[in-house]
């Protein structure tokens, strides 16, 4: 039965291999994120930003990039497909991490952090869209395993960050190593990604597009109250998470005055708890 389903969906590879390939993309995203989070105090010291307000403005460019990418991600995934966008977004995410390590002034750092936020959200949308397609292939829910893999990779990334700090490796070489590792992962796993399967016929899609006209006014429509409520809950959840990742290391170092190598054991503990 599974072989028939694979043939129907046009899959040339075993579904287990497809699943593990998709898992590797989630692992790459988690590794990229925690690599940045583990070196935030070092990057701050490199640019000698002594005022928390100014540093907060710099870090704020990441969520700004994520916000800008919300409509962009949906459009690109719908037009290009999640298969292409998953590859582009993960490679772009790794490239943005590498660029952060090369920044030689605070303005370039801000630009790279903005791009980091954009590709972060592109990864979220495209990878989860691919995951939904693989769930259809399996006929059951497996998304939790992908998200668990993300957390496991984030934990591993924090451990690597700990080793890099103890060894005196600069953020540039740290980020370069991670970017190369992610690039190899994408090149190896990309062929197993699946094309999006249309859930509507072409005629139904054309009819839906006609109903959505005029497109210029469609974004003005009032959202449902449930959507607003969920958005508010998500906003506060992200505020707490951002405070944890962006500022805890600085708090441990500047207030509690513990070594950098020790300050990021809390990040590994937090990621382990998520997993």
Model-derived regions, located:
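Central cavity-lining transmembrane alpha-helices of secondary-active solute carriers
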Residues: 60-73
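Cytoplasmic helix-loop-helix junction between adjacent transmembrane helices
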Residues: 116-146
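Helix-loop-helix hairpin linking two adjacent transmembrane segments in secondary transporters
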Residues: 150-194
